[in-house]
Amino acid sequence: MKTWNVYCSGEIHTNWRKLLSSMVKAEQLPIELTSPNCNHKESDAVGDILDPICEEPIPEPPFHYGENDKKYFFRGVKSAKINQTRIQSLIKECDFAIVTFGIGGELDFYRQWNVAFEAGCLYANNKPYIVVHPEKLIHPLKEIDSHALAWCQNYEQVISVMKSICLK
């Protein structure tokens, strides 16, 4: 039986990947889950290996850096390029993806631009994806939803769709 490679795109502030992984294991689905670097501080600082100019910690949101704007901007760009190398490789290798937009609390603050960008990368690479988000995001995510294999509101629905893809 084929083992399906499934890329998990989504916010890194909750444990949704662990939940999905435990559900995949419980259902004994032939799926290997992959994801970007989910350690927020490590992901933000990975560019420091190129030029450790920012040894002080990154400020907490809302990210008003003042006179350090340029320093943190270029730190972010360097880190993003390294992170994108991993992300693009995993996207190219995946059979399909789960694209999750979280809900509530601080997740509304982050707006999850990275997730939208990764959905665009999946589309550009002709990779099918299942999108997961609450009903209140239907309108803002209509372009992303229009290219999805399925729209799910919870991970039980995701598992049902994955069963149909991977076991039939």
What positions do the PLM features span?
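Conserved catalytic or regulatory cores that recognize and/or transform ribose-phosphate-containing ligands
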Residues: M1-K168
